[in-house]
Amino acid sequence: MADRLRSQAKLEQLQARYVGVGNAFTTKYEWMVNQHRDTLSSVVGHPPLLAYMATALGEPRVQVRKNLLEKMIMPCGPPPPSNQF
């Protein structure tokens, strides 16, 4: 019983601290967008990863960084249509 309460408290703490963890009402699209944005921001924020990607793509680091930042706006395309009226 104590382990379950401790786990629930830890999950609530993570959800309060990090947006990408989600909750029971997080849709699949929101979760995917959060994961993609977290990944892109990690690549932009770590210069060695950015240099690796720039080398692999054969483009300057500044251009790759700009492209990744632009991709963060809508990383998974437009949101699916809502069924709410």
Curated annotation (Swiss-Prot):
Signal peptide as annotated in the record: none
GO-annotated biological processes: mRNA cis splicing, via spliceosome; mRNA splicing, via spliceosome
Domain of life from the UniProt record: Eukaryota
Classification lineage: Eukaryota, Fungi, Dikarya, Ascomycota, Taphrinomycotina
Protein name: Uncharacterized protein C211.05
Entry's transmembrane regions: none
Family: Belongs to the SF3B5 family.
Disulfides per UniProt: none
Alphabetized InterPro entries for the sequence: SF3b5/RDS3-10, Splicing_factor_3B_subunit_5
Annotated Gene Ontology cellular component terms: cytosol; nucleus; precatalytic spliceosome; U2 snRNP
